[in-house]
Regions:
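Phosphate-binding loop of NTP-binding sites
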Residues: 1-105, 109, 116-121, 157, ...
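Glycine-rich phosphate-binding loop signature in dinucleotide/nucleotide-binding domains
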Residues: 37-40, 160, 213-217, 288-294
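Short SAM/SAH-binding signature in class I
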Residues: 43, 67, 152, 291-300
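Short amphipathic alpha-helix with an adjacent loop that forms part of the alpha/beta core around
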Residues: 61, 282-290
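Acidic, Mg2+-coordinating active-site environments of NTP-dependent enzymes
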Residues: 67-190, 217, 242-251, 260-272
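Active-site beta-alpha connecting loops in nucleotide-dependent enzymes
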Residues: 177, 195-271
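ATP-dependent carboxylate/acyl-activation modules
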Residues: 178-180, 303, 307-308
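Short acidic-hydrophobic, aromatic-tinged amphipathic segments that line or gate anion-handling sites
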Residues: 273-282
Length: 313
């Protein structure tokens, strides 16, 4: 996620920091991250990923964090967590560990779910912060929703005594990579590349941002399946299609079996939509009929591989 990367960049303005590399955020990646730290490391920023309850608890037992940050409780990995309530319980395992071990949590004061989760653990030390601290702070992350990630990084930086100007400079200098919240200009089109991961919450936010922007040459949304949604998959993919088509998209490309099934169930009644079972099929279509002068969104789960389309855009 973008928040851990921003936090590490901000803290690196004052401390020797080692942070999670790539997607090493599971029961294998977290130990590898810890082993890569040296005696000179002053602060470690460890991303913890999970797709089911119990996984964050395991990672906390491995990493033994002193501080914790949950940016939100979204509709991710619903199949493994068994619904949003399971996501809340699973992420709450970080607060459980911190409360039991004298740790401190950074909590966004305007997020009622997170505030309630923290309050439920009465002995948890909490550092509340206001997302308004990010107002007017320049950054290169695509999407207004990334203001929340900027605010989280600023709150952590302030707590650890990083100079305010250096915090702002670090945020402004951070260039997103790994296909997260990036805007790119190619020889033919302008792209918003956000296909490192996708879940219903992030899909909704990305589409809202994309549809809200002005475009001279027309908008093309290329959406890849959101994986690990289980029984919620059909409804969530349908909701994403409806959101996209309610906006000013010129074309909507749907890549993957889940989106294809959702569209067929909807009756296939819009000529703007094109279906592709795989990313390779979409790439072949792009090679045959390339876009030019378009504003293009690439949003989907990493497993779909939408990043492979970039060379043809």
């Amino acid at each position: 996620m973008a928040s851990d990367l921003l936090v590490s960049r901000v803290l690196a303005e004052k401390y020797a920091v080692y942070a999670t590399q790539g997607n090493l955020n599971n029961h294998i990646g977290v130990p590898l991250t810890l082993l890569a730290m040296t005696r000179d490391t002053e602060l470690g920023v460890v991303e913890m990923g999970a797709s089911a309850c119990g996984e964050i608890a395991l990672l906390c037992a491995i990493a033994e964090p002193n501080f914790g940050l949950i940016t939100n409780v979204g509709r991710a990995h619903l199949e493994g967590f068994g619904g949003v309530e399971g996501v809340r319980r699973g992420k709450g395992e970080l607060y459980d560990y911190l409360a039991a071990n004298g740790g401190r949590a950074f909590v966004r004061r305007d997020d009622g779910t997170l505030v309630k989760m923290a309050a439920e653990r009465g002995n948890l030390a909490v550092e509340l912060y206001d997302p308004a601290i990010a107002d007017g702070v320049g950054h290169r992350l695509e999407g207004a929703f990334n203001r929340l990630n900027v605010a989280a990084a600023m709150a952590v930086g302030r707590y650890f005594g990083v100079d305010e100007e250096r915090i702002r400079d670090a945020v402004a200098a951070y260039r997103p990579d790994n296909n997260r919240s990036q805007r790119r200009s190619t020889a033919r089109n302008t792209l918003v590349v956000d296909c490192y991961n996708a879940n219903p919450s992030s899909m909704q936010a990305s589409l809202a941002n994309f549809l809200g922007e002005e475009s001279v040459g027309g908008k093309v949304a290329v959406l890849g399946d959101m994986l690990e949604l289980g029984a919620w998959s059909a409804a969530e993919h349908r909701a994403a299609v409806e959101q996209a088509l309610a906006g000013d998209v010129e074309q909507l490309w749907l890549v993957g079996t889940e989106f294809s099934a959702a569209w067929r169930a909807m009756g296939c009644g819009d000529e703007r939509v094109r279906l592709f079972a795989t990313c390779d099929e979409a790439a072949a279509a792009l090679q045959a009929s390339p876009f030019a002068g378009k504003f293009v969104l690439l949003k989907g789960s990493h497993g779909i591989g939408l990043e492979r389309l970039i060379e043809w855009l």
